[in-house]
Amino acid sequence: MGEAGSGDPLALDVEAMVERLTAELRAAVRELGRRGAVVAVSGGVDSGVCAALAVRALGPQRVLLLRLPERDIGGAASDLGLELAQALGAPTEEESITAALEGLGCYRRRDAAIRMVFPDYEPSWRHKLVRSPPSGGIIVFSLVVERPDGTTEERVLPSAAYRALIAATNMKQRVRKLIEYTWADQLGYAVIGTPNLLEFDQGFFVKGGDGLADVKPIAHLYKTQVYALAQALGLPDAIASRAPTTETFSLPQTQEEFYFGHPYERMDLLVWGRDGGVPADALAPQVGLSPDAVEAAYWEIDRRRVATRYLHAPAVMLDAPLDSAESEPGRRAGPVGSGCAHTALRAAHVHPHRHPPDQRALSSPDQPPVRRAPSSPDQPSVSPPRCPPAA
């Protein structure tokens, strides 16, 4: 990596990276004892790069590309997925998840949440969630609706509506992952996860949904670097240059307005600068922001990392061994901590922070160190949309 002030601090040897990832992916699948790989493709650059790496590592006939549209996000993404499969020579399957989501109540729950803000909402309306501009403080989320006549309206979401909406829409990622693992079980394949470094580091994924995978080949690469790999791998132009989207709501939406607050090129440099301890005034010229705005971005990066710990954490294992005294009538186990009956919490934290969270992100005793920074009971704040905020 370069240094602040250099022309391209995120430059890397693309060909060498492709060769390295190909070899490591092949070894990982072999180590898992799997015969091939399943990749859910959305038509975006991340899944496209992961699919191409899998084909290089395992051969096209041992990679299944899944297209999993639903009624809010469908045709265009699925068509791009088909174009990718044809370019890579890999088999592909399309399964609509609309019926499954209807059966689980995803759309019903989502519509009920929207009607908490727009009581006259109809399913024919399109919608999306947007965040307030980065400020280094409270993040407010609003719902934008578009009526059939083309008129639009935006209203701030109260906390209850926000939580209900996120809980409902997160079902989409979880149902997709269910189908991925169904195919993986059937074929004896590994499931390939597609998050890049920004998504993995900043929590832009759903726990038990798109955050779940057996191998994550590009989770250490900045988005800028993923685009460079897409060019080197020869992906179709429509995929290699496609802007990052959310694939969640029915109105077109970028990750910038939905989650990060900055375009990916700038966000890459902000995360790089935060990890490298680059002072805000030194990074400001490179990212086109004032030093104060860089400090605000650093604050958000730290706060999201605190919240993302939960998303990366393994299950907490409660270990309560019993000694013979507990099984004998009339006898009592020793006191807690005596070694006879105790509870041990084992929750190893696996999130690879390269920079300790700013203490400001830890907030105060009445503001828990999670993704929310509530300003009032009626207004959600810093909890990013793709993951439900903690209680």
Which residues are covered by each model-predicted region?
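Ser/Thr/Pro-rich low-complexity tandem-repeat tracts
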Residues: H355-P356, S363-S364, P369, S375-S376, ...
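Short, intrinsically disordered, low-complexity terminal segments
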Residues: S338-L345, D358, V370, C387-P388
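Low-complexity, intrinsically disordered or signal/transmembrane-proximal segments
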Residues: H342, H349-H355, Q359, Q367, ...
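ATP/NTP-dependent adenylation/nucleotidyl-transfer catalytic domains that generate, transfer
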Residues: M1-V39, V49, L53, Q61-L64, ...
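Conserved G/P- and acidic residue-centered "switch" motifs that form tight phosphate/ATP-binding loops
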Residues: G44
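Primarily recognizes the serine-hydrolase "nucleophile elbow" in alpha/beta-hydrolase
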Residues: R56
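Intrinsic disorder/low-complexity segments enriched in polar/small residues
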Residues: T248, E256-F258, S327, R360, ...
